[in-house]
Amino acid sequence: MEFVKCLGHPEEFYNLLRFRMGGRRNFIPKMDQDSLSSSLKTCYKYLNQTSRSFAAVIQALDGDIRHAICVFYLVLRALDTVEDDMSISVEKKIPLLCNFHTFLYDPEWRFTESKEKDRQVLEDFPTISLEFRNLAEKYQTVIDDICHRMGCGMAEFVDKDVTSKQDWDKYCHYVAGLVGIGLSRLFSASEFEDPIVGEDIECANSMGLFLQKTNIIRDYLEDQQEGRKFWPQEVWGRYIKKLEDFAKPENVDVAVQCLNELITNTLQHIPDVLTYLSRLRNQSVFNFCAIPQVMAIATLAACYNNQQVFKGVVKIRKGQAVTLMMDATNMPAVKAIIYQYIEEIYHRIPNSDPSSSKTKQVISKIRTQNLPNCQLISRSHYSPIYLSFIMLLAALSWQYLSTLSQVTEDYVQREH
């Protein structure tokens, strides 16, 4: 199937091949772990087990910020594992979430009652908390604060539905916006980035909301099948009586209309995303922040006006993901990528869609205010001979490429 997808996108196949043959190391270099303590090595092992995608970009970060963000990620992954575990009673879960930040200072605390797939980060939490206490105080302060605020926010929604659009923003702030705020404060504390990066809470929050809303939109069917509801009732309630009924074939038209409205809401975070990325100076930090954002806009474009969201999984192509990862290394390239995908959405807006005017307005504003000089990326320079060579190479090499690292696919799977 991936071979067939590549037939229409030879440049993506070329990038897949280049990535597999060593191009990955040009922007995600392998980290030398020989000098690490055994506990820190274990932390990186857990990082790779829970998220290969984040592991790759975290390990490419410069200096001591790399270890701080590794620990930050694992602490929040442990917290998130408690939130996701439906086998934990509400009575037990709420105090666990609210008090989780205090466990960072308890060398013995661990939780062995989880049934979740990532439960090892709870069962071996002493290893993670040890490395937390080994961090510089400036990093500990940020991680403690974000963990505390996130735990309390998660507790608020344990037994509460996402009803209004304000609730949606609030929930996404707790589970993702705070991550963006925490990362930004860590970047500034490390002095790799200017103080404004950590001080502008609104832009940092939007970075997280853009990613989280994209995940929630794309994962409608998976969440429904697992009994989770993250789409705001204020929106879907205008289209249908029960959220789960969007999956019924007879409701596909109103389902897509609701989908388009939520995507339009999410696109409004793009100006803040561009402002945030434009302030970054360290290349490794820029890559770390930019790659998920361009993956998100590509995912939104794939989901827009797409009935498949309610029937199965919508994912961007592996070659597309690799191309985005390799291209999104500077601000002009990121702007061009975002312009490309918002134009793709714009040209697919149905005139009959209830949100069509709003969607056009949002995209036009982004074009004018944030992307005034951008043009669509053209790859028409590939000659017929070159294309023929690519296709032949594809046929000969596909079996080899089928073993491509999962790092690219993880970027388009939900992060918990």
From Swiss-Prot:
Pathway: Terpene metabolism; lanosterol biosynthesis; lanosterol from farnesyl diphosphate: step 1/3. One of its GO terms (biological process) is isoprenoid biosynthetic process. GO terms for cellular component: endoplasmic reticulum membrane. It is found in: Endoplasmic reticulum membrane. NADP(+) binds at residues 52, 77, 218, 315, 317. It comes from the Eukaryota. The keyword Lipid metabolism applies. Mg(2+) binds at residues 80, 83-84. Its cofactor is Mg(2+). It is an enzyme of class 2 (transferase). It catalyses: 2 (2E,6E)-farnesyl diphosphate + NADPH + H(+) = squalene + 2 diphosphate + NADP(+); 2 (2E,6E)-farnesyl diphosphate + NADH + H(+) = squalene + 2 diphosphate + NAD(+); presqualene diphosphate + NADH + H(+) = squalene + diphosphate + NAD(+); presqualene diphosphate + NADPH + H(+) = squalene + diphosphate + NADP(+). GO terms for molecular function: metal ion binding; squalene synthase [NAD(P)H] activity. The chain crosses the membrane at residues 284-304, 384-404. PANTHER family: FARNESYL-DIPHOSPHATE FARNESYLTRANSFERASE (PTHR11626), SQUALENE SYNTHASE (PTHR11626:SF2). Catalyzes the condensation of 2 farnesyl pyrophosphate (FPP) moieties to form squalene. Proceeds in two distinct steps. In the first half-reaction, two molecules of FPP react to form the stable presqualene diphosphate intermediate (PSQPP), with concomitant release of a proton and a molecule of inorganic diphosphate. In the second half-reaction, PSQPP undergoes heterolysis, isomerization, and reduction with NADPH or NADH to form squalene. It is the first committed enzyme of the sterol biosynthesis pathway. This is Squalene synthase. It comes from Mus musculus (Mouse). The lineage of its organism: Eukaryota, Metazoa, Chordata, Craniata, Vertebrata.
